[in-house]
């Protein structure tokens, strides 16, 4: 078997069920499937995660940010601790633009809008977040993509990066995400319809603009031709 990052590129589809979307000298962009933790949780039953699988191939890899277990899509992974510091600084300065696609079970009025609600943790196990006057400031931009009798598809752009931000914001305005088992409990089966589709940032190592898009999950592919015509904020 090949060693180092060549082995990683070859092994990711088999070992992690993920796609290696971008291979850069200082970082990787990986497409995480729904149902997989970004990093280990508490207890041996939560050890399996994206980063533990990747580190089985390359121990020096470091996670720059996280997605919820049930959220699919793009995650930035640093190649080493030195790269991690530079990439983490981009997130801290809010210089990484993220674009999500989601299906919500109730329509939102208008074609676009802003959800500006402070969020706080309301419950610890399982963690639940919701609007609270003492919560952390949170802002989410949304734009309608398509609408049917069953659901409304939205582009979402979080301007802040709080835990459960998109899920809690949409639930708070009466439009929870399809198959969200925390904020929209129901008998609906299948993956949660929330996908981190695109990342955009200025590379801190060579100052070039980086734009990365993922392949959409199966639930989002049917209306993709129309969605392409409604790319949000130049990030689609």
Regions found by a protein language model. Give the residues of each.
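RNA pseudouridine synthases
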Residues: 1-236
């Amino acid at each position: 078997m090949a060693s180092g990052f060549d082995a990683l590129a070859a092994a990711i589809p088999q070992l992690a069920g993920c796609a290696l979307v971008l291979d850069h000298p200082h970082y990787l962009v990986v497409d995480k499937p729904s149902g997989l933790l970004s990093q280990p949780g508490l207890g041996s039953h939560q050890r399996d995660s994206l980063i533990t699988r990747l580190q089985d191939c390359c121990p020096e890899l470091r996670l720059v940010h996280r997605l919820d277990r049930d959220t699919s899509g793009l995650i930035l992974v640093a190649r080493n601790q030195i790269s991690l510091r530079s990439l983490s600084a981009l997130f801290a300065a809010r210089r990484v633009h993220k674009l999500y696609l989601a299906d919500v079970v109730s329509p939102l009025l208008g074609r676009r809008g802003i959800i500006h609600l402070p969020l706080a943790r309301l419950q610890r196990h399982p963690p639940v977040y919701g609007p609270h006057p003492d919560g952390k400031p949170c802002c989410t931009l949304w734009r309608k993509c398509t609408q049917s009798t069953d659901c409304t598809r939205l582009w979402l752009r979080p301007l802040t990066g709080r835990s459960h931000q998109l899920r809690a914001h949409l639930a708070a305005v009466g439009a929870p995400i399809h198959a969200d088992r925390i904020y929209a409990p129901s008998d609906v089966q299948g993956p949660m319809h929330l996908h981190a589709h695109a990342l955009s940032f200025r590379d801190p190592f060579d100052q070039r603009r980086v734009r990365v898009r993922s392949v959409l999950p199966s639930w989002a592919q049917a209306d993709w031709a129309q969605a392409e015509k409604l790319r949000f904020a130049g990030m689609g």
